[in-house]
Amino acid sequence: MITTESSKKNASQMAKLLIQKKLATCVSIKQISSIYKWDNDIKKTEEFEITIKSKPELKDGLINFLKKITTYDVPQILYKKYNTEMKYFDWLDKTI
C-alpha cells in the first residue's frame, strides 16, 4: 500500500504506529515531488511517499487506520496485490 505525508516526522510517526499496531511488517519512506491540480491551480509539493508492506487480509483495517492518522484532507491511499518471493512472504507473514 502507498500513501503520502507532508513531513518526514509525520511519515516516521505513521510508520512506527503501523508496525506497533501490527498492520505492517515494513515501511519505506522516500522524499518525492508531487505535481497536481488543487482548487483550479497546479501545485507542486515536496512530500514523503510511504510504502507499506502488509498482508492482503489487513487491507481494510489498514485503510481505516490511515484515514484516521493522516494529516491530509484527501489522503492518497493506493493498494495493489503483489506477488513476492516466498522467503520474503514467510518473513512478512511471521512478523505481523
Task: Identify the role of each PLM range.
Residues 1-96:
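Positively charged, small/polar-rich N-terminal and surface patches that mediate targeting and assembly
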